[in-house]
Amino acid sequence: MAKLSPSSLVLQGQPELIACLRRQRSNVPERKRREFSFPKGDMVRNIGVWIIATALSVTVQAQVNPTTRDALQHAVSFHVPTVAPMRSGHAALHFGWQTVDGIHLFYREGGPANAPTLVLLHGSPTSSIMYQTVMEQLAATGKLHVIAMDYPSYGYSDAPDHRQYSYTFDHIAQTVAHFLVARDIQQYTLYMQDYGVPIGFRLIQAAPNSISAIIVQNGVIHLDGFPAAQDPDSMLNKYWRTRDLASDQQFAKEAAQMPFPSSANWTQGPNFPPDNELLTIISQQRPGVVDAHLDLWFDYGSNMPLYPAWQNLLKSLNVPVEVIWGSRDNYFTVAGALAYLRDAPKAEIHILDAGHFATLEDPDAIAALVAGFTSRHDLR
């Protein structure tokens, strides 16, 4: 059996496997284990609203003894492959602005135009810059055509006034769909993170036959992985029912005071590049951007009622599914990753020692996982 790499744990099968592995932990020598421990009770700020993010604390074994494996073989497939960083180099991307519905949308693109296409949808408050290194490595393989755009008001895209452009997930998804049409992208694999997940599942709903495969990274369609939204009376759900203008004003103030990344204030660690944060700071200083982001955050509450429909949609799709998750995510816990197995029992689940923006922390591992996943399937 392959040994667990330092960066990744892979499970394929049913969530019940986790409990079974916990019970068998005492049978595995210490040197053959790897433990992932996740912070509990961290207080995090998300768009001006304090939310309590209680992360899942879980211990998973790197090896399973033969008795356990035999007992599980008819119900679940378990494998722990070694994940090595990609060493094929970086291919240069090209950049541009595509005009869609009168809005200039920035995009990054690379790889052979005739290769299977991977569309990457970013989270918030970042932009397509979060995929830069991953895209360079995937383009260098010569086996994928990769493209990622910035949503309106994010990154280098235009920021139309929120009184003229409705910043809702429905509207952003419509804009993304029009962007894909403008770029003549008809069939693609979808990589979705954070806000990209509710945007992406709207695209899947609208055109399920356009999807060749699905890759989800730290984004939920199950409340399992979203502790702050589980209680109907939580601060978050109250905000989504009745917008809190005081919280909005506090966020606007904090956004305006975000400091220039420097040695004096950088707390993200050596693996997290400051370029992403600098672009976010500059982009948010444009007129109307904070209002746009607050409108979209308020509309996030429209996503939870759609979770059951998206879960059923995923069950009905006959496409490969990969889930990549940074275990140190204070917003969406690992339970959200495992929940995808209920709807896609054959999904590959990769748990990384990274945070919410794992593509910035560990792009080599993620590029390797995506390249391996896409190469194992006959994608169009």
Residue ranges and their predicted role:
Residues 115-122:
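Short beta-strand element of the alpha/beta-hydrolase
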Residues 354-367:
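Catalytic histidine-centered segment of alpha/beta-hydrolase-like enzymes
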Residues 64-94, 102-105, 110, 117, ...:
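Flexible "cap/lid" subdomain of the alpha/beta-hydrolase fold that forms the substrate-access gate
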Residues 122-124, 192-193:
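Conserved alpha/beta-hydrolase "nucleophile elbow" surrounding the catalytic nucleophile
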Residues 134-144, 182:
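A short, Lys/Arg-enriched amphipathic alpha-helix followed by its capping loop at the start of a domain
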Residues 124-135:
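The serine-hydrolase catalytic nucleophile loop
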Residues 48-59:
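Bacterial N-terminal signal peptides
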